[in-house]
């Protein structure tokens, strides 16, 4: 096995919650990987605009798995997209909005714009913080393009709503995506990684990946070398034998040994 691509979740993995910028070390590591012919893949629920800004110094060395696999970008071009059936996306959005007890706000993701149904609970500030393109809407039918992901932001945390929404929307890969987010999509990170590997002729066994949450499982389950973060939930730490406090530690050793 020779590693040909390294994928990493962003929020909670490469970028600890609350931070806005990556450490300089990861940029140097990505450049060195690129020199050795190894591709780096940010794999995130974020949109392309946000990810490209975050990785601006090394963006040309990366392939971007955006919207949890809903959209894939390489060389500033969309090379794959997995939209949701329109009627289902609107149904899910309405359900997340009406059944979150007034405590949830809904985001519908297009190819490169986030469409926000907000209640002033903090979602807008978070979207502005990470640098997404966005537009305020009042109904899902107002989204003027294909929808790749529907999410609910729960400002008091997901704990009280996980059982309410995740089983109900299992057909749309409903999963907890962080302390405040639950996502639905017809893609997932595993589908996105498979799409990249097929397009670029990379074997899944030759991929290393890092994640910290349940929406990373589809990716971690299919790659040759999966790593889970030390701060992940106990069931995830038990599922994967390779643990790390941060991807940079693993990449530092990888570059020394290869």
Which residues are covered by each model-predicted region?
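Mg2+-dependent phosphoryl-transfer enzymes with acidic/Ser/Thr/Gly-rich catalytic loops
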Residues: 1-5, 23, 182-258
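Asp-based phosphoryl-transfer active-site loop
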Residues: 4-19, 220
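Active-site phosphate-binding/coordination module
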Residues: 21-122
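Short active-site oxyanion
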Residues: 37-41, 60-62, 148-150, 205-207, ...
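Hydrophobic packing residues within well-ordered alpha-helices of enzyme cores
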Residues: 51-55, 162, 219-220, 236
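Short, structured coil segments at secondary-structure junctions
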Residues: 57-60, 68, 167-170, 222-223, ...
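Short hydrophobic/aromatic-enriched beta-strand-loop microsegments
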Residues: 61-67, 82, 126-128, 174-175, ...
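Conserved acidic, metal-coordinating active-site core of Asp-based
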Residues: 99-210, 216-219, 231
């Amino acid at each position: 096995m020779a590693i040909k691509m390294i994928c990493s979740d962003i929020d909670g993995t490469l970028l600890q919650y609350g931070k806005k910028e990556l450490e300089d070390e990861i940029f140097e590591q990505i450049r060195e990987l690129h020199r050795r012919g190894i591709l780096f893949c940010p794999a995130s629920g974020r949109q392309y605009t946000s990810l490209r800004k975050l990785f601006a110094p090394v963006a040309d060395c990366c392939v971007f798995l955006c919207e949890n696999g809903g959209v894939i970008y390489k060389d500033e071009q969309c090379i794959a997209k997995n939209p949701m059936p329109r009627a289902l996306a609107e149904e899910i959005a309405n359900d997340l909005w009406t059944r979150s007890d007034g405590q949830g706000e809904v985001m519908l993701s297009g190819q490169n714009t986030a469409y926000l149904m907000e209640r002033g609970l903090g979602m807008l500030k978070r979207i502005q913080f990470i640098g997404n393109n966005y537009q305020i809407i009042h109904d899902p039918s107002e989204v003027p393009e294909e929808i790749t992901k529907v999410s609910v932001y729960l400002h008091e945390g997901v704990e009280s709503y996980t059982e309410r929404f995740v089983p109900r929307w299992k057909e749309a890969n409903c999963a907890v995506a962080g302390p405040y987010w639950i996502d639905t999509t017809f893609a997932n990170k595993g589908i996105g990684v498979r799409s990249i590997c097929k397009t670029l002729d990379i074997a899944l066994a030759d991929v290393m990946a890092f994640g910290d949450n349940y929406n990373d499982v589809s990716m971690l389950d299919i790659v040759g070398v999966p790593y889970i973060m030390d701060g992940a939930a106990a069931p995830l730490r038990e599922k994967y034998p390779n643990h790390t406090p941060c991807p940079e530690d693993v990449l530092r050793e990888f570059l020394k040994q290869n």
